[in-house]
């Protein structure tokens, strides 16, 4: 149990749940197999320069990515900026990607696309974006990052 000094009588309880990355990945297919990372594009608490470094490290490490907070009214171009960073650091325009809007809610919408198409996608704060690694593929309407198993 953790107690903060400012509120010594307040107990913090952690309840395990399923992240938007995991639940969105299940809707989209299997984009987060092998190694992956989760990056938020919100610069409210993290400077954009640090977010940019994380994006560069992820693409240079060939990680599949789940992207939270891809766009808002004040940050309408952040997903486009993120895609431009990935493209300028080695990702190809045809890299397999996708996104899921309203995960677990009425009106869930899943879309597969390329990184080039994702750059111009209209997304919102209810959207989780998935960017495959260099081995990811779009199979039918699913985004799949293979692990190398032969089935």
Give the label of every model feature segment.
Residues 1-2, 129:
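Generic detector of short, aliphatic-rich beta-strand segments that form the cores of beta-sheets
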Residues 60-151:
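A contiguous loop/helix-start segment that scaffolds small-molecule binding in enzyme catalytic cores
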Residues 3-61:
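Class I SAM-dependent methyltransferase SAM-binding "motif I" and its flanking Rossmann-like core
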